[in-house]
Amino acid sequence: MTFIEKLSAVWQSQKTQLCIGLDPDLAKFPAHLKGKPDAILTFCKEIIDATADTACAFKPQIAYFAALRAEDQLEAICSYLRERYPHIPIVLDAKRGDIGATAEQYAREAFERYGADAVTVNPYMGFDSVQPYLERPDRGVIVLCRTSNAGGSDLQFLNVDGKPLYQHVAQLVADKWNTNGQCALVVGATFPNELAQVRALVGDMPLLIPGIGAQGGDIKATVEAGRTANGTGMMINSSRAILYAKADETFAQAARQVALETRDAINRYIA
């Protein structure tokens, strides 16, 4: 099953478009986990088990693991997801962007080492920097387009031939890079007007939408701007608001409650 097929199936089977980010920050961990050698693995597994039925994808952010020399725990988390929840896509949030030969190694890292179903990439260096990922048609390639951070406007909103650069990226991916039907775009919930414009440009292409929760994006505006005609097409990501809902031994139950509330809020505006 391809990434897009798996994503479409879980949208329908679990009735959710909530993507849960796995961004382990030891400073925010419950006290009973701090100092343990496998704290990250334990924390993430408990979050996953508590929220799996609310999620259309899990999105580990690689920098949070690499900074702590915890790539082995990330491998274990991805293995756990594949074994226990094979129906839920793994999106490796790496935002890679490099020349072709290096990109080939990054693609191997994402899809072979970690076994991710999809990976985020940076389009700034052009097609040859993305091609190694596209050569695996069963895997998803999620391209940065209009990101949720304020500084994204520095480049993404530059006027190029009468249109902002992010619209050129959206059209380029939709018209030229998506020949295998495996692409998606990152578009922030913090910019609902731009989100609506991207949706109009790319049709039913999936959108990974960060920026709700701790970043303050509005769920109603996000759903109205980002949904497809059949009410799907979105991976609306929340990380910190779910992961760190509580910092005690009930952290997983608290995370589940926030995930349920977020999923239900998304569904309320789809209905």
UniProtKB/Swiss-Prot annotation:
Annotated active site residues, numbered on this chain, are: K95
User: What InterPro entries does this protein's entry cite?
Assistant: Aldolase_TIM, OMPdecase_AS, OMPdecase_type-2, OMPdeCOase_dom, RibuloseP-bd_barrel
Q: Which CDD domains match?
A: OMP_decarboxylase_like
Instruction: Give EC number(s), comma-separated.
Output: 4.1.1.23
Q: Which GO terms describe its biological process?
A: 'de novo' pyrimidine nucleobase biosynthetic process; 'de novo' UMP biosynthetic process
Catalytic EC class: lyase
A Pfam family in this protein?
OMPdecase
Top-level division of the source organism's lineage: Bacteria
User: Part of which pathway?
Assistant: Pyrimidine metabolism; UMP biosynthesis via de novo pathway; UMP from orotate: step 2/2
Q: Which UniProt keywords apply?
A: Decarboxylase, Lyase, Pyrimidine biosynthesis
Q: Which reaction does it catalyse?
A: orotidine 5'-phosphate + H(+) = UMP + CO2
Tell me which family the UniProt entry assigns to this protein: Belongs to the OMP decarboxylase family. Type 2 subfamily.
Protein name (database record): Orotidine 5'-phosphate decarboxylase
Q: Which organism is it from?
A: Janthinobacterium sp. (strain Marseille) (Minibacterium massiliensis)
Gene symbol?
Answer: pyrF
